[in-house]
Design a protein with these regions (language model features):
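Conserved alpha-helical substructure of the radical SAM core
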Residues: 2-119, 123-169
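Radical SAM enzyme [4Fe-4S]-AdoMet core and its adjacent flexible, acidic
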Residues: 59, 131-141, 148-166, 173-177, ...
Length: 286
């Protein structure tokens, strides 16, 4: 699966501009972490262990936007922690889009549907004829409850608060490390995979761009990842991010102390990474 044309052209334009001005080093992606707090404790994630002393720290909105301006990368990946917990995530996304950035929201999917309900509540009031069929479809597919419908039709609780709306420059980048059984084991909570799938389905009905974000570990079955991508293709997912699961000191210590697991059997080495990713190029051609 190739990058969408709009993204390819935007990034290519940035590369060409930097080359023409003689820049030897420049950023193409800014990884922005507005907070380190998360609502899951995924096995293998070093972030919430590495940043255990800064869980309550929250980066001011102005600093986030200034960081993007100073870096001047065409793409910003908002991660964390769980970025949808960030109190000003809507303002941050809209601020980055106003800077003409490509925005990826790297999320575990648990709060996605709530954010999309907020979007519906704002836009339904202004154009109920357009959005009522979408509400009916979402309800028919059990992606909205009767209570959700009632709240959306009432309109937003705070009309002045921004929302995250569909645009070709913004992607929900949903964390999925395998099919249902595997993913729920890794995130250490049952039902997370199904909630992610519900969120993806809702996002595609509403016209959002969606990508998946997958980490491959030593015990990951490559066939399962291929089946995952085939399944996501049936949902209309627009792209995939796939990366090797290297170890973090904090994650290794947590794995031993809290779970009693051997980190050497979980994280990838260089050789194992080459073996696991040998088929990745064929996936990209689908």
């Amino acid at each position: 699966m190739r990058f969408p044309l709009a993204l390819t052209l935007k990034i290519a334009g940035h590369l060409l501009h930097q080359k023409l001005r003689g820049a030897k080093r420049f950023a193409t992606v800014l990884q922005l972490e507005p907070l380190h707090t998360c609502n899951l404790t995924c096995t293998g994630c070093g972030r919430i262990r590495e940043y255990s002393t800064s869980m309550k720290d929250v980066m001011p909105l102005e600093d986030c936007l200034q960081a993007a301006t100073e870096c001047d990368a065409p793409m910003v990946s908002i991660c964390g922690g769980e970025p949808l917990i960030y109190p000003q995530i809507e303002a941050l996304v809209n601020g980055l889009l106003a800077q003409h950035r490509i925005v990826y929201i790297c999320t575990n999917g648990m709060s996605m549907r709530k954010k999309m309900r907020d979007y519906l509540a704002v836009f339904y009031v202004g154009n109920p004829e357009l959005f009522e069929p979408k509400l009916q479809q979402l309800a028919a597919e059990k992606l909205l409850t009767p209570s959700d419908l009632e709240q959306i039709r009432k309109g937003p609780k705070d009309p002045a608060k921004p929302v995250i709306a569909p645009t070709r420059w913004m992607y929900w980048n949903v964390h999925l490390d395998g099919l249902e059984k595997t993913h729920d084991i890794i995130v250490e909570r049952e039902g997370v995979f199904q909630e992610c799938i519900r969120a993806i389905r809702m996002a595609k009905i509403l016209g959002f761009q969606v990508a998946s974000n997958t980490t491959v570990y030593r015990e990951t079955e490559v066939d399962e990842i291929e089946h995952l991508f085939d399944f996501l293709a049936t949902l209309g997912v627009d792209g995939h991010t796939i990366s090797p699961g290297y170890d973090y000191d904090a994650a290794k210590k947590d794995m031993v102390k809290r779970l009693g697991l051997d980190p050497s059997k979980f994280f990838l080495t260089r050789r194992a990474t080459i073996e696991k990713f040998s088929r990745a190029t064929t996936w990209g051609k689908k």
